[in-house]
Amino acid sequence: MMQGDVSPNPSLIDRTIKMRKETETRKVVLAWGLLNVSMAGMIYTEMTGKLISTYYNVTYWPLWYIELALASLFSLNALFDFWRYFKYTVAPTSLVVSPGQQALLGLKQAVVQTTPPRDLAATQISPSPPSPSIQGQSVLSYSPSRSPSTSPKFATSCMTGYSPQLQGLSSGGLGSYSPGVTYSPVSGYNKLASFSLSPSSPYPTTVGPVESSGLRARYRSPPTVYNSPTDKEDYMTDLRTLDTFLRSEEEKQHRVKLGSPDSTSPSTSPTFWNYSRSVGDYAQTLKKFQYQLACRSQAPCANKDEADLISKQAAEEVWARVTMNRQLLDHMDSWTAKFRNWISETILVPLVQEIESVSTQMRRMGCPELQIGEASVTSLKQAALVRAPLIPTLNAIVQYLDLTPNQEYLFERIKELSQGGCMSSFRWNRGGDFKGRKWDTDLPTDSAIIMHVFCTYLDSRLPPHPKYPDGKTFTSQHFVQTPNKPDVTNENVFCIYQSAVNPPHYELIYQRHVYNLPKGRNNMFHTLLMFLYIIKTKESGMLGRVNLGLSGVNILWIFGE
């Protein structure tokens, strides 16, 4: 096997592009050089005349050093630009092309050297011993207008499975190759094929090498000696045709690469000849990429999407009764996130901190049995009455804990919900695990806990009312829980109604209208958001005598401007 390691010369197109870039750069660097010389001259004139220092009455020596640095910089830039201009003018990149290539590439006569036209006639050259200078040269290097010195070389790695014996190269003509190219049989190929010339035709139609399954020659013409110009239609006369041809060839090479199981095989390598294959040639490849049905999407996913769409449409219908601005509904997710964050930062986190502070004070006072989360609500209420002067915040904390007899679970769940900043552990229809056992209906849901602490917080912000001596002003007026029912016929009723406990579901009653938002994980938050939105838009931000805006509770900021 021949060893060939000859690196190809830069392509003609690359050198053409380089030459064009040099031509364009030569104009630009000349302009920049003149500009830099002008700037340096102006600064030098100012240095000798001291115009700026005299006009502005400033110290001359610091200014002189600054001007010297700028003049030096512009001078160096000018020298560099003139050096580049001189380089591109005196020693430009030159090309040796034929007149046809010059017209095709759009080159000027002054920058190229053209080869003289030749009178060509198709001749057949007798075989000669292999020339060492072209060992490893493939038939792909043939071109009617390419000299042997500029023909690309192909290493033997590109011809795996073949042993080409090139029979000679004519020294008398340009690009004239010997037709005596034979191939020796290798595994998988049981037929010797050789090129033969047809002296009567400039385009021989003899079968090329290796006419076997999986390898069909696109260009069946063997390399011949041309001594007459080819037809006009065989030349590309403009850049557009050249670009179209190159693009089509690149696409074909890309398709062959994708369809070839082994790029190193001579019958499947993306080279010059393996195009125009038949369907049978791709049989092995098509077996690897058999048509397969895609997996069906699961029905629950489709049902879930459909349910979400129906839920969204139902929510839009309910909100349309409150506001005509449908664009506000696009901000519902943002409002919900802000509201959850407000509950966490304003209620839950301070509540947990105060509970831990009170528990610490209880231990210091010698009352470890009154630890919050361990003692009953009744015991804590009695302690709040007895020790009110010592622990004034205990009575307010007890109001938040008056939800379930299981104080340990309630305190631990409030701590879990306060973590993460946005109640990430919130479960709308259940709660958390408690002491290794799953949540059950004997424990309050997270929705019930959040609703309770929200109502209790607003109880603490509203002024006392003589009608509600227990201090639950907001809860008594604006929250109704089943089995109790609100008086829908009363126009003054404005409340949140919990119509179901497990799973929890909330409705809004306002001016004899029932606003029933869709069931699900956001039902409680969206109901509370509608409650607050009505207060902002229809009640001027006032809940009774308390402002829920910036000067009061400061909760309406979640809706933006």
UniProtKB/Swiss-Prot annotation:
It is a multi-pass membrane protein. Pfam families: CytochromB561_N (PF09786). The modification Phosphoserine is found at S11, S98, S201, S248, S278. Residues 120-156, 200-232, 250-270 are annotated as: Disordered. It is found in: Membrane; Nucleus envelope; Golgi apparatus; Cytoplasm. The chain crosses the membrane at residues 28-48, 60-80. The keyword Nucleus applies. Glycans are attached at N57, N274. GO terms for cellular component: Golgi apparatus; membrane; nuclear envelope. Nuclear envelope protein which in association with NUP205, may be involved in nuclear transport of various nuclear proteins in addition to MYC. Interacts with NUP205. This is Transmembrane protein 209. The lineage of its organism: Eukaryota, Metazoa, Chordata, Craniata, Vertebrata.
